[in-house]
Amino acid sequence: LDTVKANALKFYPDLQKSLDEKDKNVEELRIKVIAYRDFYADGDAAIETTEFIDIKNNAEKFNSFIHSLSPDGGGDEPENGLEALALSMKSDWVKDGDRQRHIIVVWSDASTHPLEKAATSSQENYPAEMPKDFNELTDWWDGQSYMSNRSAKRLIMFAPDCNAWTDIATHWDNTVHYPSRAGEGLAEVDYQTILSAIVNSI
């Protein structure tokens, strides 16, 4: 987590530099962070999130949230990455303007709980109105409920080559997958690869 946090804190200036180098101008840049663990092991501490933050004008708010994150909890694998992905799809994306990019970046070194598990578990903290299974989550990405602007959406994943992550990489459009090693953290992720993937998607 320390490596991810350090990279997150320098993310905006590095991204802006990369955009400038490619003569790309982004008038409005909003970032939302969803930090997740395991609803079935961590209860109310399973998820921490921000609203969308105007990173150009309110970087301090973003940095404060990143500093507050800790690696506590999570239990053993798997974790609730699919729920975090669903929550990101349900976000308040900007819909005005001719040129938009709705980019979701997933950093994970864990496999995922199946969405069906929620139907047989009584977790009061589990988020409302989640997809009941992977097929419904796929429908969300396809624009049947969310992410309806096909030309705007992008999904960049740094996640293990296993279960749902592999299925997403294989079957979802506008998706790039850089495999990480399950259970070994994300220190091996090339930070410049992350920046390049985002800049090239704009």
Model-derived features: positions:
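Von Willebrand factor
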Residues: 1-107, 112
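VWA/integrin I-like adhesion module and closely mimicked acidic/polar interface patches used
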Residues: 110-172
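C-terminal "exit" segments of structured domains
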Residues: 172-202
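Extracytoplasmic/secreted envelope proteins and their assembly/folding machinery
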Residues: 5-12, 33, 59, 63, ...
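Loop/turn elements at helix/coil->beta-strand transitions in domains of secreted/extracellular proteins
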Residues: 26-31, 97-103, 148-155
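Extracytoplasmic/secreted cell-surface and envelope-processing proteins
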Residues: 1, 41-45, 97, 112-121, ...
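Solvent-exposed loop/turn segments at secondary-structure junctions
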Residues: 36-41, 71-74, 109-114, 161-165
